[in-house]
Amino acid sequence: MPFERFVQTGRIAKASAGPLKGRLVAIVDVIDQNRVLVDGPLTGVPRQEYRLNNLHLTKYRIKFPYTAPTRIVRKAWVDSDLKAQWKVSPWSVKAQNICKRSQLNDFDRFKLRYAKRQRNKLLTIAFNTLKKRTKSDGTPRILKKDRRERLRAEKAKAKK
């Protein structure tokens, strides 16, 4: 699969450092190999130059003319329904979960740990009942040790 996230006009990027950290911006123009002109009309980012080292390119791209004014970028952003697409993307969901997790207090962490313990207890009980049922049915359970012994027996038969 070839590389598809190019630095180009209309490419949506996520700012990774500085005061804009976490915000989405659209690349309007490439200034040089290290800097681009970005604009984020719906994310509260004014048009400014930004270092490429501080941007993470996304798979999203909106169509607008080269060096378009902010109003045209805003219109293209709204027309592409980018906010809804970004909200359901795995990248956004993971970032939201990290943010939620970092805001847990001590009691919330305790409740989370207790809930995980309860879930694991239920899973263990269900697994053990299934294991007992397969054992009582007489269905063969193939373990690595059994498999090794069966292979040795087959080799011994083949030699005779």
Curated annotation (Swiss-Prot):
Residue span of region Disordered: 136-160
Family indicated by similarity: Belongs to the eukaryotic ribosomal protein eL14 family.
Bias (Basic and acidic residues) ranges: 146-160
Protein name, as recorded: Large ribosomal subunit protein eL14
CC terms in the record's Gene Ontology section: cytosolic large ribosomal subunit
UniProt-listed GO biological process terms: negative regulation of neuron apoptotic process; ribosomal large subunit biogenesis; translation
Source organism, top-level taxon: Eukaryota
Entry-linked CDD domains: eL14
Alphabetical list of PANTHER family matching this protein: 60S RIBOSOMAL PROTEIN L14, LARGE RIBOSOMAL SUBUNIT PROTEIN EL14
InterPro entries: Rib_uL2_dom2, Ribosomal_eL14, Ribosomal_eL14_dom, Translation_prot_SH3-like_sf
Gene3D superfamilies per the UniProt record, alphabetical: 2.30.30.30, 6.10.250.2270
Keyword terms of this UniProt record: Ribonucleoprotein, Ribosomal protein
One Gene Ontology term of the molecular function aspect: RNA binding
